[in-house]
Design a protein with these regions (language model features):
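Short alpha-helical segments in extracytoplasmic peptidoglycan/chitin-binding modules
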Residues: 1-3, 28
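Short helix-coil junctions and helix-kink-helix linkers
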Residues: 3-18
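Short strand->helix junction
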Residues: 10-14, 150, 196
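C-terminal structural segments of small proteins and small subunits
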Residues: 16-27
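A noncatalytic interaction/capping subdomain that flanks phosphate/NTP-handling catalytic cores
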Residues: 22, 30-189, 195, 205-215, ...
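Conserved lysine of the Walker
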Residues: 199
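Hydrophobic positions on the alpha1 helix immediately C-terminal to the Walker A/P-loop
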Residues: 202
């Protein structure tokens, strides 16, 4: 409005001017001439997750939060007033540009590079996940993706979110352990070992003999 007043644009033409400027900026973004900085999510918050004491605000299209995370949706009416530990933007589109940087990790499943704002992650094994742009401190991540078209793509978004969360958890003093866990005498008991060792079989035996509730059959987060 200040610019319009400075250039003496009539009030009736200001709306059209705003549309023209927005279209021009979108063209610059599309050609990679400019980009939107991490930390400015588009749209409204679709929900808040609370996992291991960490608050995650999720922005994206309606219904974008994977069903695997439904149990962690916060029911706290005041959660929206808190500053989240992680802001997660789920962008259902291809990235407008590709960021290059120093290569840190490359294998058949994952490529990680550093760049000026943090890290770029690419998952060659997840066809509908284009890229993840993440801040260096893990406080913000934008996941570029498309909706799953095949059965094997249904879990891809959840699998892409997991390393982003685990990176933040590590910075908060927690670590993940490949293990099966159960609840016994008001404490969590973890059984860890290589795949195929019988962790799930062991917890199933406890369930059968002592009716102990399962906590997790694959990955457990450990911290203070």
């Amino acid at each position: 409005a200040k610019s319009a007043a400075f250039y003496e644009i009539p009030e009736g033409g200001q709306e059209e001017l705003a549309k023209d400027i927005a279209a021009f900026v979108q063209e610059l973004i599309a050609f990679g001439a400019v980009r939107r900085e991490l930390g400015c999510p588009v749209g409204t918050c679709e929900g808040r997750l609370e996992i291991a004491g960490l608050e995650i605000a999720v922005y994206g299209a309606k219904g974008c939060i994977p069903k695997q995370l439904g149990a962690f949706l916060s029911a706290d009416d005041n959660s929206g007033k808190k500053m989240p530990d992680l802001t997660l933007e789920l962008a259902e589109r291809m990235p407008e540009s590709h960021q290059n940087g120093t290569l840190l990790i490359r294998n058949k499943d994952l490529t990680v590079c550093t760049w000026e704002e943090g890290y770029v992650l690419r998952f060659d094994a997840l066809e509908n996940i284009y890229e993840i742009w993440m801040k260096e401190d893990g406080s913000y991540a934008r996941i570029y993706y498309r909706r799953p078209m095949k059965e094997e793509e249904q879990d891809s978004l959840f699998l892409a979110i997991r390393p982003v969360f685990l990176f933040l958890a590590q910075r908060k003093g927690m670590f993940a352990l490949h293990s099966a866990s159960l609840l016994y005498l008001e404490k969590a008991w973890l059984f860890s070992g290589p795949s195929g060792m019988g962790k799930s079989t062991h917890t199933a035996l406890w369930k059968k003999l002592f009716n102990t509730p399962y906590l997790n059959g694959d990955l457990n987060l450990i911290g203070k």
